[in-house]
Amino acid sequence: MAFSLVSILLSIALAWYVGYIINQLTSRNSKRPPIVFHWIPFVGSAVAYGMDPYVFFRECRAKYGDVFTFVCMGRKMTAFLGVQGNDFLFNGKLADLNAEEAYSHLTTPVFGKDVVYDIPNHVFMEHKKFIKSGLGFSQFRSYVPLILNEMDAFLSTSPDFGPGKEGVADLLKTMPVMTIYTASRTLQGAEVRKGFDAGFADLYHDLDQGFSPVNFVFPWLPLPRNRRRDRAHKIMQKTYLKIIKDRRSSTENPGTDMIWTLMSCKYRDGRPLKEHEIAGMMIALLMAGQHTSAATIVWVLALLGSKPEIIEMLWEEQKRVVGENLELKFDQYKDMPLLNYVIQETLRLHPPIHSHMRKVKRDLPVPGSKIVIPANNYLLAAPGLTATEEEYFTHATDFDPKRWNDRVNEDENAEQIDYGYGLVTKGAASPYLPFGAGRHRCIGEQFAYMHLSTIISKFVHDYTWTLIGKVPNVDYSSMVALPLGPVKIAWKRRN
């Protein structure tokens, strides 16, 4: 009897599975995006997409065109590739495309309640305005010497660098730690920076692990890393709350760091930011600032190490603008175009985020076609794909910073719009969007350029180096596209 029941259940399951496969092969609605064929229900194309998103996108585009849907762990993801897809997602209307529903389940356990994607969009825009007010040129001018001081302290004691004349350094091991120190000292203030020397870095790491791909789908799973994530969030939030309360009760003059800035901010209705909101925003700000800088600086140093002649060109540019003594000033960066081109080119080849997503709220027709993207799908755009295509960039996979010398800055004459946190360029029909576009464009872009410019300038002033081995492939197992490690350079100290 039991055997018969098992046989019946297996037969039903087999019949359902055969029907599932046949349905993929035979049912094609010309008004819906084509669905990428997959053998395993629910899992769908998750493995192929997760291993190398750009290879997956190119293979699917060759079969289905620029618009197609793939199943990823139970979710229907509609990819819209190309510059038209970039514009469609980044400039989509709030009523049509929702970022909060795409990301809140991932970000809220890490950042906390009532911040980032755990709030209505109009409140998020106010939060971005508050943070942007603390990311002005006056703050950047004070940040440059702070970054240089942190780098001096770190590099002089690092086992990979130290006081020697030459050595070998593992960039994946050293740069994330160094950028935690520089980002925390500038954006967060002296108290938070001191905390990293007392174990804050371990808490940051535990919190960072909450951004694992599995948490896009199952953020509530009782995994050890998720328990560590929740514990780290509580401790870090408590630390920020104590700093805020201590500052409110002190007679200390306000400084230029972000905590002081947020403590003085008020909503349009006149109410001040709550302390737990400031704490959550500070956690988000630290992770955003450190993630982008850590990933990008590893790529920058690796790519420069593969072409040491560019390091010497940067050195000549630096000597011409700054002199041989490294007395850097923020306002000098505008006179160092090659430095800027190196950052642009690195972000073109290796943008930190490979996929940008929105929840589709109602059926959306694709311009110029009969296809309609159905409500409740997740729309996906991949600007990093267009940034590495021959249609837009000659020898697109080569690291060639000088290519930017001949390109027009699309932002200079682009239409601008204010989403509530200051003017940003509206144009998103571009092959190069490393910081996104539209209402969710990254407000930390200028900080990132200042941060990276200072770190690169310090390395160019102090060292020459070459990459050991070939330029690494990309590790897509994390949310931010880091190189596959180890990534080692052989360095020599300049005389």
From Swiss-Prot:
Q: Does the keyword Endoplasmic reticulum apply?
A: yes
Is Phosphoprotein set as a keyword in this record? no
Which pathway, metabolic or otherwise, does it act in? Steroid biosynthesis; zymosterol biosynthesis; zymosterol from lanosterol: step 1/6; Steroid metabolism; ergosterol biosynthesis
Compartmental location: Endoplasmic reticulum; Membrane
User: InterPro entries in the record, alphabetically?
Assistant: CYP450_sterol_14alpha_dmase (IPR050529), Cyt_P450 (IPR001128), Cyt_P450_CS (IPR017972), Cyt_P450_E_grp-IV (IPR002403), Cyt_P450_sf (IPR036396)
Cofactor(s), names only, from the UniProt record? heme
Please tell me which top-level EC class this enzyme sits in. Answer: oxidoreductase
The regions listed as transmembrane in this protein's record are 2-22
Gene Ontology biological process terms in this record: ergosterol biosynthetic process
Q: So what EC number does this one have?
A: 1.14.14.154
Tell me what turns on expression of this protein: Expression is anaerobically up-regulated via the sterol regulatory element binding protein sre1.
Q: What are the record keywords, sorted?
A: Endoplasmic reticulum, Heme, Iron, Lipid biosynthesis, Lipid metabolism, Membrane, Metal-binding, Monooxygenase, Oxidoreductase, Steroid biosynthesis, Steroid metabolism, Sterol biosynthesis, Sterol metabolism, Stress response, Transmembrane, Transmembrane helix
Catalyzes what? Answer: a 14alpha-methyl steroid + 3 reduced [NADPH--hemoprotein reductase] + 3 O2 = a Delta(14) steroid + formate + 3 oxidized [NADPH--hemoprotein reductase] + 4 H2O + 4 H(+); a 14alpha-methyl steroid + reduced [NADPH--hemoprotein reductase] + O2 = a 14alpha-hydroxymethyl steroid + oxidized [NADPH--hemoprotein reductase] + H2O + H(+); a 14alpha-hydroxymethyl steroid + reduced [NADPH--hemoprotein reductase] + O2 = a 14alpha-formyl steroid + oxidized [NADPH--hemoprotein reductase] + 2 H2O + H(+); a 14alpha-formyl steroid + reduced [NADPH--hemoprotein reductase] + O2 = a Delta(14) steroid + formate + oxidized [NADPH--hemoprotein reductase] + H2O + 2 H(+)
Q: Name one GO cellular component term.
A: endoplasmic reticulum membrane
Name the domain of life.
Eukaryota
Task: List residues binding heme.
Answer: 442
Q: What's its membrane topology?
A: Single-pass membrane protein
| Subunit record text | Interacts with dap1.
- Record function comment: Sterol 14alpha-demethylase that plays a critical role in the third module of ergosterol biosynthesis pathway, being ergosterol the major sterol component in fungal membranes that participates in a variety of functions. The third module or late pathway involves the ergosterol synthesis itself through consecutive reactions that mainly occur in the endoplasmic reticulum (ER) membrane. In filamentous fungi, during the initial step of this module, lanosterol (lanosta-8,24-dien-3beta-ol) can be metabolized to eburicol.
The remark listed among the other comments is: In Aspergillus, the biosynthesis pathway of the sterol precursors leading to the prevalent sterol ergosterol differs from yeast. The ringsystem of lanosterol in S.cerevisiae is firstly demethylised in three enzymatic steps leading to the intermediate zymosterol and secondly a methyl group is added to zymosterol by the sterol 24-C-methyltransferase to form fecosterol. In Aspergillus, lanosterol is firstly transmethylated by the sterol 24-C-methyltransferase leading to the intermediate eburicol and secondly demethylated in three steps to form fecosterol.
State the family it belongs to.
Belongs to the cytochrome P450 family.
The entry's protein name is Lanosterol 14-alpha demethylase erg11
Taxonomic placement: Eukaryota, Fungi, Dikarya, Ascomycota, Taphrinomycotina
